[in-house]
Amino acid sequence: MVIRTGIAGVAGRMGGNLVRACLADPAVELTAAIARPGSPVVGRDAGELAGLSAIGLPVVGNLSEVSDKVDVLIDFTLPEVTLAHLESCRSAGIRLVIGTTGFSAEQRQLIAAAAEGMGIVFAPNMSVGVNLALKLLDIAARVVGEHADIEIVEAHHRHKIDAPSGTALRMGEVVAKALGRNLQDCAIYGREGITGIRDAKTIGFSTIRAGDIVGEHTVMFADEGERIEITHKASSRMTFAKGAVRAAVWLMSQGEGLFDMQDVLGLKG
């Protein structure tokens, strides 16, 4: 069965890559391309918007216009937009792949509650490499984390509006959980001035915003005499798009529930 797939955020940074990834995967059919209401791209052909030839699929400004044509929606928008799509998808029986970042704790709880009645893949990073790195971080934290100083450094392009990145926060969550800590209690976001001696139980975050960096993350476990660094660098957003499409295909074989890319890739356990 070919999966009817929609893209929300088709005019954004991920939009063109998602269009190309859908068109390249024989398991899916791109049946909807959604931008914000009033966007100048509404009415344009989704293929042409992605820098390809026309595919006969006009961009629409509202999910309700195409909800009967979609089995699974891939959403890379903004938190408030994703939450609106969440309600529409639940009502229409559409599965949802969420790549949006920048959610508050309360918004994340809304997503988790909605997943009790629908299938959702929610991951701040759809890259296979990043999710393999998360697995390695869990192992490293259990082996050396208790005695190491842990720092997370991330870099993205100048246009990214949330910091730290969702991926950096997820990395911090994985490390903290492996150590039996709560990230909210031990995270330090940047340092300035006279900060005093480092608290050994903290996890530090540093953020860089510059140029056109697609995404780079390094987690450092620094002990006396040695340190371990686990790094992932993305050179193209296509890796995220391919991962999102892979998640959409996987999700169609699942029931209700909240999943992440670790589930999709079989990395849990």
From Swiss-Prot:
It catalyses: (S)-2,3,4,5-tetrahydrodipicolinate + NAD(+) + H2O = (2S,4S)-4-hydroxy-2,3,4,5-tetrahydrodipicolinate + NADH + H(+); (S)-2,3,4,5-tetrahydrodipicolinate + NADP(+) + H2O = (2S,4S)-4-hydroxy-2,3,4,5-tetrahydrodipicolinate + NADPH + H(+). Gene3D superfamilies: Dihydrodipicolinate Reductase, domain 2 (3.30.360.10), NAD(P)-binding Rossmann-like Domain (3.40.50.720). NAD(+) binds at G9, V10, A11, G12, R13, M14, G99, T100, T101, A123, P124, N125, M126. It holds the Pfam family DapB_C. (S)-2,3,4,5-tetrahydrodipicolinate binds at H157, G166, T167. GO terms for biological process: diaminopimelate biosynthetic process; lysine biosynthetic process via diaminopimelate. NADP(+) binds at R36. Pathway: Amino-acid biosynthesis; L-lysine biosynthesis via DAP pathway; (S)-tetrahydrodipicolinate from L-aspartate: step 4/4. GO terms for molecular function: 4-hydroxy-tetrahydrodipicolinate reductase; NAD binding; NADP binding; oxidoreductase activity, acting on CH or CH2 groups, NAD or NADP as acceptor. Its main location: cytoplasm. SUPFAM superfamilies: Glyceraldehyde-3-phosphate dehydrogenase-like, C-terminal domain, NAD(P)-binding Rossmann-fold domains. Signal peptide: none annotated. Its EC number is 1.17.1.8. Keywords: Amino-acid biosynthesis, Cytoplasm, Diaminopimelate biosynthesis, Lysine biosynthesis, NAD, NADP, Oxidoreductase. InterPro entries: DapB_C, DapB_N, DapB_N_CS, DHDPR_bac, NAD(P)-bd_dom_sf. One of its GO terms (cellular component) is cytosol. It is found in: Cytoplasm. It comes from the Bacteria. The active site is at H156, K160. NCBIfam families: dapB (TIGR00036). Belongs to the DapB family. Catalyzes the conversion of 4-hydroxy-tetrahydrodipicolinate (HTPA) to tetrahydrodipicolinate. This is 4-hydroxy-tetrahydrodipicolinate reductase. It comes from Methylococcus capsulatus (strain ATCC 33009 / NCIMB 11132 / Bath). The gene is dapB.
